């Protein structure tokens, strides 16, 4: 009798486990499209010069743009250091979409990367902008270049120039 109950319980648990474990079969289209695993991270973080805060990009739902926000590591206090209103293209009046930013060594300018295009596996082509935090001036680099053709832009060590690659040539702008 006990054996019959044990067999019945085992059979029910195996059958119900098989039903709950039924999943959609993997196919190549889902894998290539990136529909299999989706992760959500906190995005890129950059330590600021003071060594006590880091900056992150955050969407501003009111403006549709991107704020650059600083968080203090000790207490996680939050401060918007560059509002999306400063990251607006003056010619169109619309906020520029921000993919990533890098700071100059003195934290007085930021290099903004946007409008990215994939080359092989990585988004290495795009457009670059420089925001001068002293006067709030936002300037697009490579104005005469084709859209999304610039790569690997970096500040000079003194933060006065930016170098980038486009069409296998190296350019430097003040």
Regions found by a protein language model. Give the residues of each.
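Glycine-centered signal
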Residues: 1, 19-20
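Beta-propeller folds
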Residues: 20-174
């Amino acid at each position: 009798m006990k054996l019959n109950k044990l067999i019945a319980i085992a059979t029910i648990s195996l059958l119900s486990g098989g039903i709950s474990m039924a999943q959609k079969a993997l196919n190549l289209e889902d894998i290539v499209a990136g529909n299999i695993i989706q992760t959500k991270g906190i995005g890129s973080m950059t330590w600021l010069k003071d060594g006590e805060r880091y900056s992150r990009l955050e969407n501003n739902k009111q403006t549709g743009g991107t704020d650059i926000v600083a968080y203090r590591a000790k207490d996680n206090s939050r401060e918007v250091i560059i509002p999306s209103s400063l990251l607006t293209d003056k010619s169109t009046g619309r906020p520029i979409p921000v993919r990533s930013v890098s700071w100059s060594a003195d934290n007085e300018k930021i290099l903004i990367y946007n409008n990215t295009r994939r080359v092989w596996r990585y988004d290495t082509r795009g457009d670059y902008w420089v925001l001068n935090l002293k006067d709030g001036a936002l300037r697009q680099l490579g104005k005469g270049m084709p859209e999304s053709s610039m790569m690997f832009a970096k500040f000079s060590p003194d933060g006065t120039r930016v170098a980038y690659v486009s069409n296998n040539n190296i350019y430097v702008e003040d």
